[in-house]
Swiss-Prot record:
InterPro entries: ACCD_DCysDesulf (IPR027278), ACP_carboxylate_deaminase (IPR005965), ACP_carboxylate_deaminase_bac (IPR020601), TrpB-like_PALP (IPR001926), TrpB-like_PALP_sf (IPR036052). Its EC number is 3.5.99.7. GO terms for molecular function: 1-aminocyclopropane-1-carboxylate deaminase activity; D-cysteine desulfhydrase activity; pyridoxal phosphate binding. Belongs to the ACC deaminase/D-cysteine desulfhydrase family. GO terms for biological process: 1-aminocyclopropane-1-carboxylate metabolic process; amine catabolic process. This is 1-aminocyclopropane-1-carboxylate deaminase. Keywords: Hydrolase, Pyridoxal phosphate. Its cofactor is pyridoxal 5'-phosphate. It catalyses: 1-aminocyclopropane-1-carboxylate + H2O = 2-oxobutanoate + NH4(+). The modification N6-(pyridoxal phosphate)lysine is found at residue 51. It comes from Cupriavidus necator (strain ATCC 17699 / DSM 428 / KCTC 22496 / NCIMB 10442 / H16 / Stanier 337).
Length: 338
């Protein structure tokens, strides 16, 4: 497997830290050791996150093509579009963001705080669109690219979550390689890796990266889309493509893609009582913030699996913290009492 063949434009601080979640582990019985790898702290570009790691492999193509405008898409509180806006500002590029109404949630300031607020501050052309949630290619995004062309610009398309981009899975192959290097220093290997999945390329990259040492099916995806079958299919497709790109040397099978569908509800972007409990528990025991859309749901899944005894006693479980905390402001009503 060869990731070094692909050019990478550094946007992150370097390897993200891994630290124990000792108080959380103890509160859940102490039979499973929980750790977190902090990709939520990976960059100085508007707080970074998992999309920043992915975009390190996309930006060389942007620059090679001579594009002058990054065009991307997400929900109103998209972490991805905030990271695209930050990178555009950092590189001196223009940025057009299509922000669709993906979440069935009403808050007086939902479209004015958090991620979308930062994107506007960074100078992005933010375009609110009424269409609902879908992880596929969207007409509104294609229309935005055409508008840039008509204005004389040269757009570069970055799909939702960077997932449909041909290079979108590479960053999290690198994540797996990074974990292996850190494991050598820690003196042990993680038995399971827990990660949130919606558009799919984060888990897909991990599946390929950990397949190199036989742990593909130890990557436990927690679905947060509440539409798990399209998500599962997209993870598998991206993983197979990425495996070919890096020369994994074996096929990725359906058995390699583990997606737990118990925690995505009630809808995309809407937290359950269990999600809110997980957000508060990790915050109050570890000072580690998670969000209602993504990481709160994967944290809920990990906590529930420990409580149910689904990880064997003595397991070491790595929680991949992908970011998402800037969206908390948009859900302020849910946390008015803490």
């Amino acid at each position: 497997m060869n990731l070094k063949q692909f050019p990478r434009h550094s946007l992150t601080f370097g390897p993200t830290p891994i630290h124990p979640l000792s108080r959380l582990s103890e509160s859940l019985g102490g039979k499973v050791e929980l750790y977190a790898k902090r990709d939520d702290c990976n960059s100085g570009l508007a707080f970074g996150g998992n999309k920043t790691r992915k975009l390190e492999y996309v930006i060389p193509d942007v620059l090679a093509q001579g594009a002058d405008t990054l065009v991307s898409i997400g929900g109103i509180q998209s972490n991805h579009t905030r990271q695209v806006a930050a990178i555009a500002a950092h590189l001196g590029l223009k940025c057009v963001l299509v922000q669709e109404n993906w979440v069935n949630y009403s808050d007086a300031v939902y479209d004015r705080v958090g991620n979308i607020q930062m994107s506007r501050i960074m100078g992005a052309d933010v375009r609110l669109v009424s269409e609902g949630f879908d992880i596929g290619i969207r007409p509104s995004w294609e229309e935005a690219m055409e508008s840039v062309r008509k204005a004389g610009g040269k757009p570069y398309p970055i799909p939702a979550g960077c997932s449909e981009h041909p290079l979108g899975g590479l960053g999290y192959v690198g994540f797996a390689e990074e974990v292996r290097e850190q494991e050598a220093g820690l003196g042990f290997r993680f038995d399971y890796i827990v990660v949130c999945s919606v558009t799919g390329s984060t888990q897909a990259g991990m599946v390929v990266g950990f397949a190199a040492d036989g742990r593909a099916d130890r990557v436990i995806g927690i679905d947060a889309s509440a539409k798990p079958e399209p998500t599962r299919a997209q993870i598998l497709r991206i993983a197979r493509h990425t495996a070919e790109l890096v020369g994994l040397g074996r096929d990725i099978t359906e058995a390699d893609v583990v997606l737990d569908t118990r925690y995505g509800g009630p809808e995309y972007g809407l937290p359950s009582a269990g999600t809110l409990e997980a957000i508060r528990l990790s915050a109050r025991l570890e000072g580690m913030m998670t969000d209602p859309v993504y990481e709160g749901k994967s944290m809920q899944g990990m906590i529930d699996m420990v409580r149910r005894g689904e990880f064997p006693q003595g397991s070491k479980v790595l929680f991949a913290h992908l970011g998402g905390v800037p969206a908390l402001n948009a859900y302020s009503f849910l946390f008015k009492d803490g």
